Design a protein with these regions (language model features):
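Short, hydrophobic secondary-structure boundary micro-motifs
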Residues: 27-28, 63, 103-105, 132-136, ...
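A ubiquitous short alpha-helical element
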Residues: 51, 77, 105-107, 124, ...
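All-alpha effector-binding/dimerization core of bacterial HTH-type transcriptional repressors
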Residues: 71-128, 166-178
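Long, contiguous secondary-structure blocks with strong helical propensity
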Residues: 2-12, 114-121, 144
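Hydrophobic, amphipathic alpha-helical faces that serve as interaction scaffolds
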Residues: 84-95, 117-158, 189-192
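Short linear motifs at protein or domain termini
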Residues: 1-95, 210
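C-terminal all-alpha effector/ligand-binding and dimerization domain
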Residues: 148-211
Length: 211
């Protein structure tokens, strides 16, 4: 199979979207490289290159003899990630200038998770610090699957996003920081349920997610 110029980036983006938004793989499960090659019409070379890139982004892990795996996720892991995310966003809100302006309405066509990630990306951009932008983008990627679980667990998910966006659009820095902290505290209380959901376990299932 001959890979045309640009195939590597196309395969990377396709695999990333698939693994974050479409795949039913659970934490700790193995990535099937031949299946990805068939799915995206690419040879194993760009597929493996894309997977190594995702390992670098901490969206996958690679272990000798086991290949590529969906990262295992424990409650402390997810708690740390939520706390890292709120620290980044509160810092961004504290140092934000007025640009780019944030509309009180999410971009047309965005789903609930995309609308939230768009808001957080815009808050990071307003900090004027490219490292904050990269860090928030990376945290959003790693939190994408947990946010899919949040949609099932938080009926007011979209209302929360609209409230945060409204505060950001109004330029209420103090109120926005307080709302961001409160939002993430609610998520921290849900960590056990989110981790169980990602492992395919119900609240009544006596099994514990693998450590």
């Amino acid at each position: 199979m001959i890979d045309r110029p640009g195939t590597g980036e196309r395969v990377y983006l396709s695999i990333k979207t698939f693994l974050l938004s479409e795949s039913a793989l659970r934490p700790g499960e193995r990535i099937d490289v031949p299946e990805l090659s068939r799915r995206f019409g690419a040879s194993a070379t760009p597929v493996r290159a894309a997977l190594h890139r995702l390992v670098g982004e901490r969206l996958l892990t690679a272990l000798p003899g086991e290949g590529f795996l969906v990262p295992r996720l424990t409650e402390p892991d997810l708690s740390d990630l939520y706390q890292w995310n709120v620290a980044l966003l509160v810092n961004a809100a504290r140092s934000a200038g007025g640009e780019p302006a944030i509309s009180p309405e999410a971009p047309e066509g965005d789903g609930p998770i995309a609308a939230l990630e768009d808001l957080f990306a815009r808050l990071a951009a307003r900090s004027g610090n490219v490292e904050v932008e990269w860090a928030v983008a990376g945290a959003s990627d790693r939190l994408h699957r947990p946010r899919c679980a949040e949609l099932e667990l938080v009926p007011e998910f979209q209302e929360e996003t609209r409230e945060l966006r409204g505060l950001a659009a109004a330029g209420s820095s103090t109120a926005l920081r307080q709302a961001l902290v409160a939002y993430h505290r609610r998520r921290l209380r849900l960590v056990p349920a989110i981790v169980r959901s990602l492992h395919g376990l119900s609240d009544r299932d006596p099994r514990r997610p693998a450590e």
